[in-house]
Amino acid sequence: MSNTISVEDVPLNRFHRLLTVRSGGGSFVDGYVLSIIGIAMMKVSPALGLSAFWEGLIAASALIGIFFGGFIGGALTDRLGRRVLYFVGPTLFVVCSLAQYWVQSGEVLFALRFMNGVAVGIEYPVATAFLVEFLPKKNRGPCLATLTILWFAGAAVAYLAGEAILNFGGPDAWRLTLASTAVIGALLFIVRLGTPESPRWLLSKGRHAEAEAIIRRVYGPEFGLDNLPVQAESKNLSFANLLHSGYGKRMAFVAIFWTCSVIPVFAVYAFALRCWMRCTSGATGHPMDPLPLPCCSWWAASSRLA
């Protein structure tokens, strides 16, 4: 028995909630992996004998990786599918984070942090594509906003976990701090097992039978390809074509806005603790005094997006 209800208008179901957790877990790990360096750097610099130049480069390495990872993730998710790329990020988190435990030089740490950044960059287009293509249209905004909230939650947990590890982890605690992301990355990989491919992507590749099977699995046996909204014919456009098709100014606005927003926030998470300790040198202060920064950011994001 079929119906005429579009999958865009169905109620939020268990699969949608689980998919939000799966994609939101990526944002949580992103916030954790990008912020943990802020507290670990307190011990990393003297242990590896880093200069101010290498401190800054290592702190910025993940941000550089995100730039490249975003392009890579966007291109590969259209070519290879959402599901394949959905597991690349967690895999890189685990491998690169574990490798940081044995790091012996600033150059190697830079490379590993860069690859962690690439993993974060891949996460953004893949996770959002999954949510947009599966969620009902009335629930997309709130669920996508949840990703931002979870990013700040991950950043706050990074400060708490990092402080705990540094206090009780012994002389090489900074290595455990950097490697701790592997635990969350492994959990994220496990949680994402069983995620189906996007039926919209399958349709774009002419794999209609697979797409219909997934639609029935997610929405119920009474749903099929006819319940998907009509998709515009896909065209392969170059970056230059995109810029000259009326989207150039919009892209510039978004790019400039996010650059001016992200870089200062990233700098705060990477250097706030170190600057705080230098400013309070010789005075009474605790390393976790700056913790309200990520916690307040999390609260502010939650309040604005609720």
Model-derived segments and spans:
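Transmembrane-helix signature of 12-pass secondary carriers
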Residues: 1-306
